[in-house]
Amino acid sequence: MYLKLIEEPPKEIFSYYEKPFYVYLSLSNLCNANCVFCDVRTNKEKKCNIDIFKLIDELSTLGTKYIQFTGGGEPFINDDILQYMDYCTKKGLNIIFISNGYNLNKEKIKQLSSYNIKAVFFSIDSYKADIHDSLRRLPGLWDRVTNNINLIKEYIPNVKIAINHVLNRENIDDFDNFIKLKENFNFDFINPIVIKDCDELFFSEEQIINYNKNLSYYYELAHKLGIEFLCDNIDFFKNNISSLGDRSSNNDLRCVYPSFCTFIDAPTGFVYPCDCSIHRDRNIYKIGELKEQTMEEVWNGEKRKVLKKKLLNSELNCKTKCDEANCQFNYCYFKHKG
C-alpha cells in the first residue's frame, strides 16, 4: 500500500486497525508477457478458482476500503474483471489495479471511467520501446501502454497514475531519460523498484556508483517536471542490498501491516498477510484457504493471529526482503503511535 495513492490521511487509515482496509487480489497467474525477471510463470496454479463476487461481499462486510487487482499475472486477461470492478463500485469499494497495459483500449477505458478507480500502476522498464519490449518479451507493448496512459488521463482525469520501473543493468544508466518521459505522456508518480532474484540483470559496481553520483539530479529533475516518487527515498544503495533483494537496513523492522492488509491468491484460494509474503514458505506465511474457509474465518483465525504477533516482534526473516512501501507504512504507523 502506497500512502500517496490513498485518499484517507494516515490517521484515518490507522483507525481501521484489525480490519482488512487494503486487499491485494491476484485473479490468475496467466500473463500475455514473459518478463525476463518474473518467476510467476513457473507456478502451476493458473486460473481463478474462487467466487470473487462472494469474496467482495465478505470483504465489504469486514470493512475493506480498497481492493487492488494486482500482479501474479495480467489482471486484464481475466474476462470478468470489469464485472468485478463494477461490483466493487456498487459495494462502495475503491479500486486500484496494476497492468502492463497491453489488453486495454479506448472502449475498456471508457467503461473503467464509471467505476471507483482511484489509482493505476503501469509497468514500463525503459524510455526506449525496444528495451522495454525485450525485457517484457512482448512486441508492441511500449506503444500500447504509453497510448493507454494518455487515454486514461483523458477519460478518468482524477485517477492517479504510477509507473512501476524495475531498475536493472539494462536501464539504470538511463534513469534521467526515463524521468523525462513525463514530457511525452501524462503520469503522476514513478515507482522505481530494484531488481532482485535475477543475477544476470543486477547492477555492476560502476553503475551503482554512477547512480549515487546522479541521485541529487534525479530528485531535481523529477521536481522540475512535476513528478513524485511513490516512496520519497530512492537512495537504494545507501544501505547494503544484494542481488536477492536483501536489505540489511530492515533487520529491526517491526511489522503491523497484516493488521490492515491481506493478499488473496485466487488460483489457489490461499490467503497471505501481505503482498511480500506470497512467494515465501507457505507453511509459515499462508494464513488460510478460501476453498475451505470463509474470509471472515481466515481474518479472525488463529494462523493470522500467530503470524501477526511474530511479525510485530520482528521474528521473521521476510523483513529483509520487505518492499519499501510496506516499510514506510510501518515507520509511519509507529511514528503516529509515538
Residue locations for each model-derived region?
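Radical SAM enzyme [4Fe-4S]-AdoMet core and its adjacent flexible, acidic
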Residues: 26, 47-50, 94, 114-267, ...
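N-terminal pre-core extensions flanking Radical SAM catalytic domains
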Residues: 1-44, 57-61, 242-250, 259-260, ...
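Residues within well-ordered alpha-helical secondary structure of globular protein domains
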Residues: 58-61, 87-90, 151, 181-184, ...
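Polar helix-capping/helix-linker motif
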Residues: 105-106, 175, 300-301
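Conserved alpha-helical substructure of the radical SAM core
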Residues: 1-119, 201, 207-211
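Extracellular/mature segments of secreted proteins
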Residues: 263-266, 282, 326-337
